[in-house]
Structure formats: structure tokens, C-alpha cells
């Protein structure tokens, strides 16, 4: 089993803690709620042994990554921007992205918005629902007020 390396990188205006292992094509593992990189501790060495450079960040507001105070700093655009910046900080141009639970929408949106970077996407433990009559943002406003 390979030893995990921990470090902090600057991305999208925040300091992001990452755990990483291995060499090869980049695979990014986005944790769920309320978790951290540690959720991927068993997958990191296995993927590294399989020939990948695997990275599990603490996402914005979790673990040892910065937690901006403003609620508006936690949009999908910010979260995906953090991951795009992570790819850049690692001097890579493409990556596979996998999300678990709350990390799945980050993975989906990263692949949707930046297909030039994210060439494959995986989502675990999250339901996919049929498109509703109302946009999800409108439903959230109704359920959570302003």
C-alpha cells in the first residue's frame, strides 16, 4: 500500500487540503455531506496501485480547507471552480471526477460545464430524479425562503 501525501494548494481564492497518492491519469474524488477526504481512504491506495494519480480534496467549508463565511460563496459555480482550479494547480489538463452523495452534483456539473477538462464522471449514492415541472432552484427557494 502506498503512503498518502497531504498538502494544501491554492485554488479559486481558497486554501484547499488534499490527500493524494499514485502517478498516472488524474482521478478526483469529491466527498459527500458531512464528510471529508477521509471518506475515500480505502479507495485512494487501490486507485493509486491501479496506476492513477488519485486526489481527494476536503471541499470548500470542510476539514482543513478554508470555509468562507458568506453563504453565497458555496454555489455550484464556486465548488466546481475549486475543482477546476485544483486540476490547474496540479499541472494537469484532464481528469476523471467521481462524486459521492453531495459531491455527485459537483462532479456532474464539472463534467457538464467543463467537458474539455473532465473526460469521465462517476456518481455514487445519490438519486437521479426525473426532470420536474419547475426548475430545482425555484423549488429550493420555495422550500428554504430567500
Segments the model singles out, each with a brief description of its role:
Residues 10, 48, 88:
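Short polybasic/polar patches that bind polyanions
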Residues 5-11:
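Short acidic-hydrophobic surface loop/beta-edge motif
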